[in-house]
From Swiss-Prot:
One GO term (biological process): smoothened signaling pathway
Source species of the chain: Gallus gallus (Chicken)
Site residues, Involved in cholesterol transfer: 246
Residues bearing a lipid moiety (Cholesterol glycine ester): 200
UniProt tissue specificity: Expressed in the posterior limb bud mesenchyme, the Hensen node, the notochord, and the floor plate of the neural tube.
Keyword Protease annotated: yes
Cited InterPro entries: Hedgehog, Hedgehog_Hint, Hedgehog_sig/DD-Pept_Zn-bd_sf, Hedgehog_Signaling, Hedgehog_signalling_dom, Hint_dom_C, Hint_dom_N, Hint_dom_sf
Leader sequence segment: 1-26
Gene field: SHH
EC number: 3.1.-.-
Motif Cardin-Weintraub per record, residues: 35-41
Lipidation (N-palmitoyl cysteine): 27
Protein name, UniProt field: Sonic hedgehog protein
Length: 425
């Protein structure tokens, strides 16, 4: 207990110091963490435009239809009423059905209501259609699941609808369509779909290389393990495993499958996790440099090159990505953190970080945590360091803290939309 209190105090002091230092480190040109953000210029959507520019029920938008919800179905408990006084519900059926929606839809709608009042003082958000129990929409409409709403402004000024659609995009709806001159259509992903795609993790079946030889499943890592990683220059080294930033035992997740041929490798990781990609210029020989860019797994494309452990196990080789696909696994999801901030998973070099597409920023943000771990290891005898964090299910508290701060100080588009599931409000 004393050690845990010491750890917490060290982390808090270190984190505060880091924030104070950031104001001095980010005053130069370019977008810095401590730099004041200017309001982003919003462009209204054009009539019949939809964002993202894919079909509504595809993976890149709101996802597939999962079945109609009725008042007698088991899934009816997934719907929650929205009594926000800043939203006007038309409720032409006079049943309150338009107020029922999924929690994700409710959260986005409430955020949009605030934006509408800020954009047009005296004007409120108006919902004309929400959950549909009467079959008035097309087959497999997301209205039947409480995942879609049709909206206008309270003054019904159609000249505002293009900007209303843009505000809906900014509020976080997964698909927004300027469907009709009379309304805007918005929809969201299913709750279980968001959870399955979110986070920055590897499957429990992934393996790491240990310092004393052999491999180990990532889910079995424990404090004291030293695993193969690489420094900023691509030199291989063994680094201490510190904790899991996220741990979901036996959960079902949707992973991106990155495959290479020369050398042959296959890595599974979630959309928001970072993977190092080599520079694009041609190289006839391996340079062993990791000076390439860290990209979200969802942004890696065939033809780009990732770093793979060579056959002799002595160096990293840039290997061309042969294919990128999606696969669902139920072996759990794990995000190991090493002192180096990198790790070789299934012989492929990856970052330990996710959510923000800046490996160096993320590694810097975890400096107070690494410092605390180092001090605690020096102050406590062997075996006395608390290990509960490595076995606790869910997202590490320090990661949650950084995510909250990042959401506050960074532009919304700097964070991966599937980086972390927002807690229900």
């Amino acid at each position: 207990m004393v050690e845990m209190l010491l750890l917490t105090r060290i982390l808090l002091v270190g984190f505060i110091c880091a924030l104070l230092v950031s104001s001095g480190l980010t005053c130069g040109p370019g977008r810095g963490i401590g730099k004041r953000r200017h309001p982003k210029k919003l462009t209204p959507l054009a009539y019949k435009q939809f964002i993202p520019n894919v079909a509504e029920k595809t993976l890149g938008a709101s996802g597939r239809y999962e079945g109609k919800i009725t008042r007698n179905s088991e899934r009816f408990k997934e719907l929650t009423p929205n009594y926000n006084p800043d939203i006007i519900f038309k409720d032409e059926e006079n049943t309150g059905a338009d107020r029922l929606m999924t929690q994700r839809c409710k959260d986005k709608l409430n955020a949009l209501a605030i934006s509408v009042m800020n954009q047009w003082p005296g004007v409120k958000l108006r919902v004309t259609e929400g959950w549909d129990e009467d079959g008035h929409h097309s087959e497999e409409s997301l209205h039947y699941e409480g995942r879609a709403v049709d909206i206008t402004t309270s003054d019904r000024d159609r000249s505002k609808y293009g900007m209303l659609a843009r505000l809906a995009v900014e509020a976080g709806f997964d698909w927004v369509y300027y469907e009709s001159k009379a309304h805007i259509h918005c929809s969201v992903k299913a709750e279980n779909s968001v959870a399955a795609k979110s986070g920055g993790c590897f499957p429990g079946s992934a393996t790491v290389h240990l310092e004393h030889g052999g491999t180990k499943l990532v889910k079995d890592l424990s404090p004291g393990d030293r695993v193969l990683a690489a420094d900023a220059d691509g030199r291989l080294l063994y680094s201490d495993f510190l904790t899991f930033l996220d741990r979901m035992d036996s959960s079902r997740k949707l992973f991106y499958v990155i495959e290479t041929r020369q050398p042959r490798a296959r890595l599974l990781l979630t959309a928001a996790h970072l993977l190092f990609v080599a520079p694009q210029h041609n190289q006839s020989e391996a340079t062993g440099s990791t000076s390439g860019q860290a990209l979200f797994a969802s942004n890696v494309k065939p033809g780009q090159r990732v770093y793979v452990l060579g056959e002799g196990g002595q160096q990293l080789l840039p290997a061309s990505v042969h294919s990128v696909s999606l696969r669902e696994e139920a072996s759990g999801a794990y995000a190991p953190l090493t002192a180096q901030g990198t790790i070789l998973i299934n012989r492929v070099l990856a970052s330990c970080y996710a959510v923000i597409e800046e490996h160096s920023w993320a590694h810097w943000a975890f400096a107070p945590f690494r410092l605390a771990q180092g001090l605690l290891a020096a102050l406590c005898p062997d075996g006395a360091i608390p290990t509960a964090a490595t076995t606790t299910t869910g997202i590490h508290w320090y990661s949650r803290l950084l995510y909250r701060i990042g959401s506050w100080v960074l532009d919304g588009d700097a964070l991966h939309p599937l980086g972390m599931v927002a807690p229900a409000s």
